Amino acid sequence: MAYALPNLPYDYTALEPCISKSTLEFHHDKHHAAYVNNFNNAVAGTDLDNQSIEDVIKAVAGDASKAGIFNNAAQAWNHSFYWNCMKPGGGGQPSGALADKINADFGSFDAFVEAFKQAGATQFGSGWAWLVLDNGTLKVTKTGNAENPMTAGQTPLLTMDVWEHAYYLDYQNRRPDYIADFLGKLVNWDFVAANLAAA
């Protein structure tokens, strides 16, 4: 069962000026599409072909002989998740149960923000920053390259892509500025709250 490249949940210009139309076109239509195509080609005709992409990621994680499948599956999933983590006019602070949980587990929203900024800024090279639910507790973590916290039994709630292709056209080497805009102007807290409620 082929995994389909999802449409962006907003127009290519919707996240400007934080993320440009050019970045979204390259990132979604080229990078994300390539991961999806490579994944589908890699599993076609195998026993993984009829499994969900999440099950494939968990099944092949850590298997060096299936690194190509894992990398493309995880990157396809990570990007699909990432698009939904942003929205036009996003950012600010969450409310309701999510806000209460962040305050309980981090001490304050500001403490969460600092932890998330640190995770994104200190991820050496390519990777992702995440807010996850780990045995009932919210935690910030980071993963290199295509890695996904679901392989460690954690539930992803929010992610930020810190591969250079996510921000370089707009921010060049200023990753901290991209991170600040992501948190302050782009995060889709409704999506994060729904992920927490479903966990």
Swiss-Prot record:
Pfam families: Sod_Fe_C, Sod_Fe_N. The keyword Oxidoreductase applies. Belongs to the iron/manganese superoxide dismutase family. Destroys superoxide anion radicals which are normally produced within the cells and which are toxic to biological systems. This is Superoxide dismutase [Fe]. Keywords: Iron, Metal-binding, Oxidoreductase. Its EC number is 1.15.1.1. One of its GO terms (molecular function) is superoxide dismutase activity. Gene3D superfamilies: Fe,Mn superoxide dismutase (SOD) domain (1.10.287.990), Iron/manganese superoxide dismutase, C-terminal domain (3.55.40.20). Binds 1 Fe cation per subunit. It catalyses: 2 superoxide + 2 H(+) = H2O2 + O2. It is an enzyme of class 1 (oxidoreductase). Its cofactor is Fe cation. It comes from the Bacteria. InterPro entries: Mn/Fe_SOD (IPR001189), Mn/Fe_SOD_BS (IPR019833), Mn/Fe_SOD_C (IPR019832), Mn/Fe_SOD_N (IPR019831), Mn/Fe_SOD_N_sf (IPR036324), SOD_C_sf (IPR036314). Homodimer. Fe cation binds at residues 27, 79, 161, 165.
